[in-house]
Design a protein with these regions (language model features):
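Short beta-strand segments
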Residues: 122, 158, 198, 241-243, ...
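Active-site capping/gating regions of soluble enzymes
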Residues: 1-44, 54-73, 180-181, 188, ...
Length: 364
């Protein structure tokens, strides 16, 4: 059901919730989790009226806060890990490409059932484009799913692979960076308080030394991180991720890691003294997005370099205070290897293909 005006929304909320001087007061949380919430989600995503769409989103986000559901940055957890105060876990980041409300409900149900720790919902720059899900819409739907399933606590929503297009950058670098800054603005305004900046596409292995190979990567990465720090809401330190090896390309190594982080930190401190840097670093260890399809429809097994993953995670924590290294393309690995990630202190793994496959093949 699409609402025709704001009054219809207020009537539907009678006895359930009321607006009071810009705040939302919940009178009956159980009824809020009923059909009215589903209607609000539908209108928040699809109502042709910007006013009705906006009010529906406001009600959902306000209700989430009232019910103890907080859209958050994972920065504090990553900082604690970087100090060595906690260990032995890996944070999964799940790409929400389709059926977002139903899928996120299933994720929250599973999290409650298993008493899960931290987990992240995310959407990449490319996925925002082809799924037509803007940050403001997706964050609303995720919070609504949390309300529906009775979840309480922090909710982490991430912009994944906010990536520089190398070809476009070569043709007009100012235009390409401006486009990414607009995406960052939209992401932060939409509640993406975790953003992975991917400038690894600018790494040029034809250069004579590792610093020059990584130069465009750390220079543009520092510029975009500075921009995030200038936009982040008061009281929130957005968790920013960096990347040194493009997924599907050459495996990363210690020299690349140190060249990127040393120069990134130096530039950021010079441009914005005291600014928080990145909290984690994505590396390449042998995976590719979506895997390598074989003629029979299966996906080729991946030879993952676990030694590199462990070593670079350790260096990033002990030398730079990061949470550790991040493994992209983890869906391409057999499930019997997943125990290796927390054992090796991997900060996070990104899961997109598996989540999409579940959406296609199973009941939510």
């Amino acid at each position: 059901m699409l609402f025709n005006n704001n009054e219809e929304i207020n009537q539907a909320l009678q006895g359930i919730a009321t607006q009071d001087n810009g705040d939302l007061v919940i009178n009956n949380a159980d009824k809020l989790r009923g059909d009215i919430l589903d209607k609000l989600v539908l209108n928040a995503a699809t109502n042709p009226s910007a006013e009705i769409k906006g009010l529906s989103r406001f009600i959902i986000k306000s209700a989430a806060l009232e019910l103890g559901i907080v859209n958050s940055s994972i920065q504090g957890l990553y900082e604690t890990r970087g100090r060595g105060e906690i260990k032995g876990f890996t944070v999964p980041a799940l790409n929400i490409r389709g059926l977002p409300y139903e899928l996120c409900r299933a994720i929250f149900r599973t999290a409650i059932k298993t008493d899960a720790g931290a987990f992240i919902f995310e959407l990449a720059k490319s996925e925002i484009g082809y799924t037509f899900q803007k940050p403001q819409e997706l964050s609303t739907v995720i919070l609504a799913a949390a309300i529906k399933e009775g979840y309480k606590g922090s909710v982490f929503i991430q912009g994944d692979h906010f990536q520089v297009n190398a070809k476009n950058y070569a043709q007009d670098k100012e235009k390409e960076i401006a486009g990414l800054k607009t995406l960052i603005e939209d992401g932060i305004a939409g509640g993406f308080y975790n953003i992975d900046i991917d400038t690894s596409t600018l790494v040029d292995l034809s250069k004579p030394n590792v610093v020059e190979q990584q130069r465009a990567n750390f220079e543009v990465g520092a510029e975009l991180t500075k921009y995030i720090r200038e936009l982040e809401p008061a009281g929130i330190t957005i968790s920013v991720g960096g990347e040194i090896g493009e997924v599907g390309k050459e495996n990363s190594n210690e020299k690349e890691l140190r060249a990127y982080l040393d120069n990134f930190n130096e530039i950021l401190e010079k441009e914005k003294p005291g600014a928080e840097g990145i909290s984690k670093i994505s590396i390449q260890t042998g995976t590719s997005h979506g895997g390598v399809p074989l003629p029979d429809g299966t996906v080729a097994e991946v030879n993952l370099d676990f030694d590199t993953l462990e070593n670079l995670s350790k260096i990033s924590r002990e030398s730079y205070g990061l949470a550790g290294a991040v493994q992209h393309g983890a869906s391409t690995l057999p499930q019997n290897l997943f125990h290796k990630f927390p054992e090796l202190e991997t900060a996070a793994i990104h899961l997109a293909t598996d989540v999409q496959t579940i959406t296609y093949s199973r009941s939510l």
